Amino acid sequence: MRIRTGQILSAVTLWALTGVITSTLPAISIAQSPAKVDSRFEAARSAIRQAMEEKQIPSVSVAVAKDGKIIWEESFGWADREKMIRATPDTLYSLASISKPFTATALMRLVQQGKIDLDKPANDYLGAVKLTGLAGDASAATVRRVLSHTAGLPYHYHFFYNNEADGPPGMDESIAHYGLVVTPPGEAWEYSNLGYGIIDYIIARTSGRDYADYMRTEVFVPLGLTHTSVDIGPGLESYAAQRYDAQQRPIPFYTFDHRGGSAIYASAHDLVRFGMFHLKDHLQYQQAILKDSTLDQMHQSATPPVPSQPGLGYGLGWITKADDHGYSAVYHTGGMPGVSTALALFPSEDLAVVVLTNSYAGITPKMMQAIVGCVLPKYADAVRNDKEQNPPKPGPFTPNPQLLGAWTGTVRTWKDKMTFSIVFQQDADIHVKLGEQLETLVNDASFRDGALEGRFVSSITTPDVNRYGHTLLLHLRLRGDKLTGQVIAETPDDSVHYALASYAELIRKTDAK
């Protein structure tokens, strides 16, 4: 199951991999409760317990800070069911995409020091291997645009498991193969984990230090985050929550070629204090590693409007929402095998809320809403009103008249080019043919915010993609008599390994009837 926020490239949320589990695991259990919990949170505690039981979630850790003070921290369930280790507020959870605000914070330190200019091309800070401009000029893919997912980089994730032979390629290889400008820079917000792999590479190259070491000494330690690290740092192994799949099986440890977008672990206690720093609630022992004006800049949307999602944007490492049930919010979520996380900031209310889990069950947003509603009654009322309205479900795909007919072109992989054709019929069927493979139909088609999306059965023939079974995902934009964008090879939910993009360009066949 894949959850998208609007556009297919706006969010990445993944399900889990297979593993091994014994038949004598402890049942879901609530970790030792604090001596006293603010009575406002009883409804949220009940909602968490119910969700854990219904979805068989091994553990949940939460934290809330209001007006510069932590007012609730609690953990429920098992950090490691096999070892019978209970979760606590100091348990390290894999954060997935909440890694991005941390990485952006580190990058902004270098900006403040005058070592990086946000408005210079990202290529200026790379080595011999550069981003390749295909749909637009690579020099327009600035550092600011990479941070805000508007550089035109492709949809991308690439997982490497410890129980498998393959390991992550070097960043130069990933950039050579997938560092493609597939949308004109600045045109649209299209989420790219690869972009944050490039950011962590820029941090390492500019600072002259390994990304993980730079994060530790320049962000985690100055902010007093003792239970936060890139991957699981030395001495923190016993604190780390095991990641579990949907069948409650432990998932082997994995890493990526986009560490800056996905590789950070943190406890609920540390993460809420990171949120407090971004709310300018600087704790006595925390160093002011960024100016308040820099924090403000990070929290301002830097993306073009998304017509289907008014008020939604992306700043420098943070998602921004002008109206989240009556309040302006700055937040990030994370989802990947065995991970579902959320960190939300409500600056006008000086409120930070954290929800961390060690499985993916798709209910973290509901937990977050329940907790925020306990603190902000008007927010809770607005959430209830939304549920009562029951917005209509999207109707079946209807082809845009501008798409009707036949289109022909190529898909450019890092290895070669393949012929590619699409025919849009009046009955809404979409026929595609890639290379010499059989013609097939596109499923789950949609056309929204100027982008055509859908999925079809065919194959990309590069060696890295050929390792696992996959289907192909379309993400194309209509530009006059051209369709340009991405064809993305993506592995299935029960074997999450990659989403790897190739550039596609087609022109309308003038002789089509």
List where the protein language model places each region:
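Bacterial N-terminal signal peptides
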Residues: 10-26
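Short, surface-exposed loop or secondary-structure junction motifs
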Residues: 76, 80, 134-337, 341-342
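Central antiparallel beta-sheet cores of small beta-barrel/beta-sandwich binding domains
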Residues: 408-473, 498
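Short, gly/Ser/Thr-rich active-site loops of penicillin-recognizing serine hydrolases
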Residues: 356-419, 490-493, 498-513
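Active-site SXXK
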Residues: 42-48, 62, 68, 92-122, ...
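Short, glycine/proline-biased beta-turn/loop segments that scaffold the active-site neighborhood
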Residues: 118-134, 223
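Short, well-ordered beta-strand elements
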Residues: 342-345, 349-359
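Short, conserved catalytic-motif segment at the N-terminal edge
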Residues: 35-95, 115-117, 131-132, 168, ...
